[in-house]
């Protein structure tokens, strides 16, 4: 299944996040729902399984992912729009998303990767504002230029801490061949 974690040292940020994870519960207790939330808590068994993973994440995995990011970034600089992380921030790099020049270039790269047997993903084929959940909202049907553009051009490459250098090079070569 899916899971996640949010780390912050800011109580102003942490409090609403905790609330969202418990059905939007407010300070008044169980039935004091102050926002729309969901049940996003882990049970004890899931937490026990994930605890060693947190240690690996801190000890090795983020650094290993960062090395892949740096290698991808050097290979694609000036050819595709590469992701960045703002100064003072750290990314766990769950995905490595690139932006092609246009949809045609993105589709050509994605097809070439598929043909080469290299997994890739278009995580956001439909902009969030165009999803059915928002069809009844007042803004539905409006154009959100940046979101529309991003969804038309983005795709993601394999990203994990155990991606061997030879695999990274195969991915890089396949993307560059498609350009």
Region annotations inferred by a language model:
Residues 1-6:
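Glycine-rich phosphate-binding loop of ATP-grasp-fold ATP-dependent ligases
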Residues 9-179:
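PLP-dependent aminotransferase class I/II
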């Amino acid at each position: 299944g899916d899971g996640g974690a949010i780390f912050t040292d800011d109580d102003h940020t942490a409090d609403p996040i905790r609330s969202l994870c418990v059905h939007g519960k407010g300070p008044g207790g169980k039935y004091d729902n102050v926002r729309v939330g969901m049940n996003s808590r882990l049970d004890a068994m899931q937490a026990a399984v994930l605890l060693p993973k947190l240690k690996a994440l801190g000890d090795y995995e983020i650094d290993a992912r960062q090395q892949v990011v740096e290698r991808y970034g050097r290979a694609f600089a000036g050819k595709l729009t590469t992701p960045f992380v703002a100064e003072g921030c750290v990314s766990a790099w769950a995905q490595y998303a690139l932006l092609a020049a246009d949809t045609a270039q993105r589709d050509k790269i994605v097809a070439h990767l598929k043909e080469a047997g290299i997994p890739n993903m278009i995580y956001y084929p439909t902009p969030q504002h165009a999803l059915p959940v928002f069809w009844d909202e007042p803004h539905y049907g409006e154009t959100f230029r940046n979101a529309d553009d991003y969804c038309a051009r983005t795709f993601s490459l394999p990203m994990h801490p155990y991606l061997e250098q030879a695999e990274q090079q195969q991915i890089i070569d396949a993307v560059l061949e498609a350009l």
